[in-house]
């Protein structure tokens, strides 16, 4: 593999000009995310069939040539298991590569495992066993070693030739339109951003709290998410989730009480007064400003029967259409559908099981089934 290390704006512009002559590119990123809220970009890998490039973001100030490539509709971008890479692109460039196809999704429609790893795919299609020893390396450290660079370059060097085979295979299976729809769904999921005022809904065991405690949790979770984004710090490095829940549950009135709830010294030192102020604010809210009690999906009287009935329907659809039941519906998607049906959580879009390619296969049957399970 003869790769080119791109470390300057001029080199990036020259590379992108050359890439424009090709109809498809393989992309990958290397990043670090240990304590930060946002992934920290360490490297971008690109291969168009002729130019194999490692783009070092630490030396680039003008990203406009690459952004133009990413949004060029005449160049298809291929990634493998690219959901986290998409988050990197959104964070760095404010947009996603378009059009985009994920080879892990293509492979799933061709009967491969749902989470088929890149190394397994390369071994099957190319007969090459990849060295994955650098997968946990520090991609922000400089200089990068030759071994690191070769590891990174291999991710796109082997990916691009495989894409053509997978596209043919998926099209022959008759599932290519559905696979492309699933790629669009992956992008849509990645672009969903939690509003701080809704962050409390994602706190484990929030449903166990009463209304004023929920109001307190709403204030605490809103503050924590804003602080995490502002400081680029993972939310649990601001205040741990279980500690946030405990503060909402017991609504302490002193730093000593925070300590007795098990909060760490640093949590109390840096945020103790803020937490107490938010508790006090929740204490003074009028009754009509309190949120409605949360209902736990799994405690709904018909949940187990409804879940089992949906699973049975999915098995039937899977066998009829000769497609993996695991690909057709996950536990998360079934729960999303039931949350929507029983109006337990606000949702901006139709549940995934009754929209897109899945909806074409089973929306009508699911709607009929759900009528048997009113709230």
Curated annotation (Swiss-Prot):
The answer to whether keyword Hydrolase applies is yes
Q: Which UniProt keywords apply?
A: Cytoplasm, Exonuclease, Hydrolase, Nuclease, tRNA processing
- PROSITE patterns per the UniProt record, alphabetical: HRDC
Q: EC?
A: 3.1.13.5
Occurrences of domain HRDC (ranges): 210-289
* One Pfam family cited in the UniProt record for this chain: DNA_pol_A_exo1
Keyword Zinc present in the record's keywords: the answer is: no
Q: What is its main location?
A: cytoplasm
Against InterPro entries, the record matches this protein to: 3'-5'_exonuclease_dom, HRDC-like_sf, HRDC_dom, HRDC_dom_sf, RNase_D, RNase_D-like, RNAseD_HRDC_C, RNaseH-like_sf
TM segments? none
Gene Ontology CC annotation, any one = cytoplasm
Q: Which SMART domains match?
A: 35EXOc (SM00474), HRDC (SM00341)
Q: Biological process GO terms, please? A: tRNA 3'-end processing
The 3'-5' exonuclease domain extends over 3-169
Q: List the disulfide bonds.
A: none
- Annotated NCBIfam families: PRK10829.1, rnd
Role: Exonuclease involved in the 3' processing of various precursor tRNAs. Initiates hydrolysis at the 3'-terminus of an RNA molecule and releases 5'-mononucleotides.
What is this protein called in UniProt? Ribonuclease D
UniProt source species: Escherichia coli (strain K12)
